[in-house]
């Protein structure tokens, strides 16, 4: 109650992820330009395209950027900040079957679509995005296409703990091996690609940047909440590139769907938070 919201008409995305973050940063810059007596340390600002497809830091030059540490403004609630995120892998599953006329296929046909369905079932319903929360990891089958002869499936694997991630990879390998064995051939191949890692491995070595966020939030009247991200940010990759980079909120909610909205009041608090942080820079 009493908040001002930005929404769409419900038929499209709002794009607050991450237009809201850009607006907060530029509002901070505007304030600095209009208030020349505002004292602050040296600051560096960058905007990265293609974050949503995992390529936001592909050409980012950390040395040229010139900062000792940074914060992405790409989260949700304005009183939340994050220095943990998922470890992320992509799994490309290729299934090569044997196609025969269905009327004369007994003992001969190996249906790649059927193997794909069986493979996915073996991963378990309790390890899917719609069944997990908090730090629970998941397999997400987000693309599948094919026919009897060839079927391709693309998964994303997510977990905050790398040991759990390795177990998930092993489970997929065991499922493929089992189906190959019971069908007396080699039909299923899996290629795994590391996408990003949990930034906490880096942030734990620089705890002062976490303390600065907590103190800045308290100073502007927020009660800080450290919340692990069930996703990733450019900050995860930047952290492993030598630029420790926790994530701050934007006041946006329900990202990536038609019910997305953003709180103007929260965005204003986001500007205050950045100004408080750079005073301590």
What annotation goes with each model-predicted range?
Residues 1-12, 96-99, 220, 252-256:
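Glycine/charged-rich beta-loop-alpha catalytic/anionic-binding loops adjacent to active sites
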Residues 2-86, 132, 136-142, 153-160, ...:
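Acidic/histidine-rich catalytic neighborhood of metal-dependent amide-processing enzymes
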Residues 70-105, 110-114:
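Phosphate/diphosphate-binding glycine-rich loops and adjacent basic-rich segments that engage nucleotide
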Residues 95, 151-159, 192-199:
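Short, hydrophobic beta-strand segments
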Residues 110-128, 163-175, 211, 215-218, ...:
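His/Asp/Glu-rich mid-to-C-terminal helical/loop segments that flank catalytic regions of hydrolases
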Residues 114-131, 138-140, 187, 197-245:
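Active-site-adjacent substrate-binding region
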Residues 140-170, 174, 239-246:
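Active-site-adjacent mobile loop/cap segments within catalytic or ligand-binding domains
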